[in-house]
């Protein structure tokens, strides 16, 4: 009986630790326009996303591609870390060794003839800032 109890306890702890892991991906949205500045609606578009280290022209530490469908407003939504990996791994990015920049390239015709649409510095979200502060708090004395 004791072995069964121990086994169940270990199983619960293992499963709980798996679910406690933060996903190694993050959301991204963009509005897609063609060369004539018209919205690309309800269409498949090709997207290449690169995480650059150091500057807007830094080394690409992670690159992936997606083919996604825009909605009626030209909006595309994807999860970076869930595409077809071309280079690197999200899990291996040393986020403490930044800054990092997100470069997006889009082919509004759904292929791989990408044009750079944006390169922006990746900044903290309030959730991450809160987590950083929580890590500084010492143990409570009971």
Show where each model-derived region lies.
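Family-positioned intrinsically disordered, low-complexity linker/tail segments enriched in G/S/T/P
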Residues: 3-139
């Amino acid at each position: 009986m004791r072995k069964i109890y121990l086994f169940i306890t270990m199983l619960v702890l293992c499963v709980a630790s798996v679910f406690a892991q933060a996903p190694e991906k993050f959301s991204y949205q963009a509005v897609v326009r063609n060369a004539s500045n018209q919205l690309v609606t309800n269409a498949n578009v090709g997207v290449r996303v690169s995480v650059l280290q150091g500057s807007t022209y830094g080394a690409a530490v992670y690159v992936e591609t997606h083919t996604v469908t825009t909605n009626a407003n030209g909006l595309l939504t994807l999860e970076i870390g869930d595409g077809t990996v071309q280079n690197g791994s999200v899990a291996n990015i040393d986020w403490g060794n930044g800054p990092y920049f997100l470069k997006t390239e889009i082919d509004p015709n759904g292929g791989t003839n990408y044009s750079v649409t944006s390169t922006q510095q990746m900044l903290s979200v309030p959730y991450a800032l809160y987590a950083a502060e929580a890590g500084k708090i010492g143990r409570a004395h009971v």
